[in-house]
Amino acid sequence: MEKDILVRMQEDLERALKRPAEKRRWAMLLDTRKCTKCTACTIACASENKLPPGQWYRPVWEEEIGTYPKLQRVALPRPCLQCDKPPCVEVCPVKGPDGATWKETKGIGAGIVPINYAKCIGCGKCVSGCPYGARFLDNGRFYTEGTPQLQKYETVPSFEYGKEWPRQGKNQPVGNARKCHFCMHRIANGMLPQCISSCVCRMGYFGDENDPDSLIAQVIKANKPKLLVLKKNLGTLPRVYYLGQTDLSIFNKHLKA
């Protein structure tokens, strides 16, 4: 019996974590042909990272293609693309080795674009600078605000970037720029990103692209000519690949000009 791809990717992850950080290349591939538009990934991510109402790390965009009577509804989940040339980092005013956002080169998160909530000044320049709309400023709202008591599930801390962040009052990350980070706090503990684990249709692949034995590397190799990235013309070199669409430009209305 063939292994569930989650089992395979879990084994790949355990192997990847034993490799030197500089030899790993975390990547994600999303096969939109399998997406049922259930948004389980969106909700699981919001729960994992304690996101405010209406603000998402991984929205699922939907569009219609074709003409009546041959119409088709297609979907595109959009996490942060973890660009190798991230425009958001370039426009951040808090620079330097102890800056607010950067392209990580060391440790578990090597290759990811993280945010240091303690250094972020909430200016929003990175939000405007991301052409994919993958960042937002935490608006400080709660789902149960206006009720007699905020529910505990909203005020317990998240564990992004390996630290505890109690999202209460004006505590960080309220007011900070926020974004997807491939759930590096989970990866550091040997778990796959929450969006990958929660996908009931198994449309997401994650792992070390540099490991030829990993499932994601093999899927990328087998489908190389068919793979697409969002706004390739920008030269940002995203680490999130899409399979199953022939033209991603139909989703451009969701992106910044």
Segments and roles (model prediction):
Residues 1-257:
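Non-ligating segments of multi-cofactor redox enzymes
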